[in-house]
Amino acid sequence: MVNWKIGVLIGALATAAFTLLPFSNAGLIAATPQQSYASNVQLHAKRSSVDFVPDGDSSKLAWKQAKWAEFDNDASGNSHFPEILTRVASVWTETQIYFFFWCRYDSLNVYQGEDPKAERWQLWDRDVVEVFLNPLPERMNHYYEFEVAPNNQWIDLEIDKAKEPFNDASWNSGFAHATRIDAKNHIWTAEMRIPISSMNVSAIHPGAEWRTNFFRAAGNGGDDRRKFLAWSIIPEGKTFHVPARFGLLRLVK
């Protein structure tokens, strides 16, 4: 896979290269900045009365009461893959925001024999779920990326598309995460807890509206053989990094 996080192509190569890249988080070229949001999909994140430690178990009361979204379409919205149907939910407290992914799978493609405690560069080249999160939507091109793999490997990045390279792997959110694999039923789950202070947010209040998109990469081989799903579709691009297509995350009571 082309390693988009090393840098950004320059000058005249940029436009041409953008059209040739596979549809994945690993798109090398940032999309042209847009001034308004073009997606009307939304998810309600309900308030949790307590904070909790992620363990990958959806039986918690918070997740039973949560609003769930599901998607099986590729990032362009043109194809559907029910065999890797993905569900996602979010809840929040005054200091944390949580996400839970429930994922069908055929087979798993992960890095073998590595320490899941260490941040894993190029995690997007294996099976992964991803949250792109913008708590300050008026700042469209500055947001945060969180990835977790079935074996609980992870990476987090600060994205600023005004910079080259636009991704900062040195940023560390301190987010907690856990996964479970149900091999019998071919389901894997991932649970994330993100401190809002890591994103320069001092508090969450009911009624807040953030912008987000959820992604999943699955399958073996090169990008031409893998599947790349998106909650809010991106019909105009070849990269996940099109913040104008982020959906709406409503933080409600």
Q: Where are the language model's segments positioned?
A:
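Bacterial N-terminal signal peptides that target proteins for export
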Residues: 1-13
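Bacterial N-terminal signal peptides
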Residues: 10-25
